[in-house]
Amino acid sequence: MTEFIPAGTLYHALPSPFPMKRGGVLHQARVAYETWGTLAADRSNAILIVTGLSPNAHAAANQANPEPGWWEAMLGPGKPIDTARWFVVCVNSLGSCKGSTGPASVNPDTGAPYRLSFPDLSIEDVADAAADVVHALGIAQLACLIGNSMGGMTALALLLRHPGIARSHINISGSAQALPFSIAIRSLQREAIRLDPHWNGGHYDDVRYPESGMRMARKLGVITYRSALEWDGRFGRVRLDSEQAADDPFGLEFQVESYLEGHARRFVRFFDPNCYLYLSRSMDWFDLAEYVEERPVAGSAIDNARADARPASAKPQTGVSTADTVLAGLARIRIARALAIGANTDILFPVQQQEQIADGLRAGGADAQFIGLDSPQGHDAFLVDFARFGPAVSDFLQDC
């Protein structure tokens, strides 16, 4: 069980006990975060970034850690998210292995890693933990809440469960619910990990580690993070040189196979498998349509107590999830301005889901805009296609 924490990481201690949406509590839990820029005296210039499944809080270089971050081209002085103007906070998701408390963390009640004793994790838990960081920094209202990929889900949950926490919102390649295709892919990824004998019911170590399962899970993910258009343009049917090809008659032969293998091997030892399982499943469970019907969902006493403390519009409900109920759930969110952006080639979070977000927020009274970008790079476009995503984000923030 390993955590992978960047230098310069800051920590916020969550209330103890910290109740989880689906039952159970965390004791002495923490959230990892980093900051950029200077908070204005009136605390009106704060932006919060909530991330996808795998990133840490190190979105860009800063004084505490000058190493480039995972969103380096988007965040910094003079960049689309201009830290000469904005005070930016990026949090690592609760449940991760990159600083925030998760299955790889030590359970203070036992002195051993949580592993599978970690409570069921929901996107709402990730959102509530992020909101607690915002409040601890003395920020009453964010100028903008930015969420990408899984972070788009987290952002919507945050806005719904913590009304008034942000004046504006940018949702990048996110969604208001998990679609069947995405659920199916993630279920296969989790199955690949759990079928690796070294996973051993979550009890692995650095010597006996489910590397094969993690490698297969990552390959499946990478295939969905990009598009067929990009695969064709980058690799075609080009074969490896004879000295690069595997001797195994069913081994690596094409360049695209080699790319997937290399990408997977670079990932598998830098993300904890149990954390991967928990975060992956939290996305499958997320559905804003739960917040629409009138009859509350049955839950634990802790869950119900926490839900009772929130506005009625922010309590999960029962009912069949349809396009109409998702839109109705989105319409419960109160935000002044919003931008939903996606790539037209995204198969994991299809661009129609970002359009749905804009439609739903608009129904709730927001000045909401949708932009579908013609990027060939699929779901991961927001991480690489800065020529398209950068101006869209920059233009929106100009008026915040």
From Swiss-Prot:
Record-annotated AB hydrolase-1 domain positions: 45-385
Domain of life: Bacteria
Gene Ontology terms: cellular component: cytoplasm
InterPro entries assigned: AB_hydrolase_1, AB_hydrolase_fold, HAT_MetX-like
GO term, biological process aspect, one: homoserine metabolic process
Major site of localization recorded for this protein: cytoplasm
GO molecular function annotations of the record: homoserine O-acetyltransferase activity; L-serine O-succinyltransferase activity
Listed pathway(s): Amino-acid biosynthesis; L-cysteine biosynthesis; L-cysteine from L-serine: step 1/2
Function: Transfers a succinyl group from succinyl-CoA to L-serine, forming succinyl-L-serine.
Record protein name field: Serine O-succinyltransferase
Organism whose genome encodes this protein: Xanthomonas axonopodis pv. citri (strain 306)
Gene: metX
